[in-house]
Amino acid sequence: MNESLSGMAGALFQQLQGAPVQQMSAQLGTDPQQTQSAIGAALPLLLGALGRNTQQPNGAEALLGALQRDHASSASGNGFDLGGLLGSVLGGGSQATTPQTDGAGILGHVFGNSAPTAAAGLGQATGLGGDKAGQLLQMLAPIVLSFLAQRFLGGGDNANPAQLGQALGQEHAQAQQSGGIAGGLLGKVLDQDGDGDLDVGDLMKLGGSLFGKH
């Protein structure tokens, strides 16, 4: 499954190999191979959900604003400091949570009220269980946004919501086309009323939660 990852999900998956996977595994108390497999499902799920959100009116602008507000430091230099960011994310109670590292808050913006559904589905599909899958998503969410900030804010004034929306839209399409865990979960998570259709009511809920006020 992980070998089929492409685009931004594949690029970020490669950056997380080695020490980051080991650190997250130690935090979760899981086998590194299982953690790696779960990351391979979680990244396209997160990026795909962001891609669907950015297709809503003003969605890309809202996400770009959140990146500029909370994650702009990741756009400086030669790339975001993955080791430092992961250390902050895994620091737990020893460090004050900031908007940049607030994984639970970010998930709430990405998935709205369906964040528990995303965690439960990922946990069931990967064998992590809902609690550990939720923890993994909270670890990955700040990393995903910092990765996006490094990619799309690096040009300073050239930051373009249309380019961000297009790139994330491609991630959403790839996740759906590839099927697998992420593709199946995207449908369940985005169909918030459980009727099998992504309707206006579902989109209104998502739009209302998308990177609004903290």
Give the ranges of each region predicted by the language model.
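A structural "flexibility-hinge" signal
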Residues: M1-H214
